[in-house]
Amino acid sequence: MTMSLITIAVELTPGKEVRSAIQQGLFDANVKATGDGHFDAVCVTARDADATVIGGVVGEAYWGWVNFTTVWVHPDHRRQGIASRMLKLAEAEAARLGYTQAYLDTFSFQSPDLYLRAGYEVFGQLDHFPAGAQRLFMRKTLLSQMPEPMSGNTPQRDIG
């Protein structure tokens, strides 16, 4: 039996192909272990009168859960309930797609009360991340009710 040489090294600037190979390898292993490679993207945006994106929620959904990875509102539009409404609509979309649970992580300086008011509970915390702050991990069971879209229009879906 011939043993091939394996080199293990730090790559300071890994290219897209390196990251893609690693991510695809993990994805393939997960599909093999679970038999389920289904994935849905959830995205809700808020736009101003000029159709400029002034906020959004981005989520990745699989295995019954949606992970809201990004929730953002432009500073000029904060404290108007936009984040709450977008989050509620994103949760409803995930529920419509069949997902029953949501999770996210946030920092103590990123308005964690928004998520607590929305019914999320903290299930983990990392102190001093960054120094003087905490990173909070939250989860919620989703309800299957559809909130009103922000503009009164029906949600748009990018099919394709």
Where are these regions (language model features)?
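Conserved short alpha-helix immediately C-terminal to the canonical SAM/SAH-binding motif I
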Residues: M86, Q110-S111
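Conserved GNAT acetyl-CoA-binding A-motif
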Residues: A94-F107
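Acetyl-CoA-dependent GNAT
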Residues: I6-T69, H74, F109, G124, ...
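Conserved catalytic-core motifs of GNAT/GCN5-like acyltransferases
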Residues: Y103-D105, E121-F137
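Conserved acetyl-CoA-binding loop-helix of GNAT-fold acetyltransferases
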Residues: R79-A92, R117
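Conserved active-site tyrosine of GNAT-family acetyltransferases
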Residues: I22, Y115, Y120
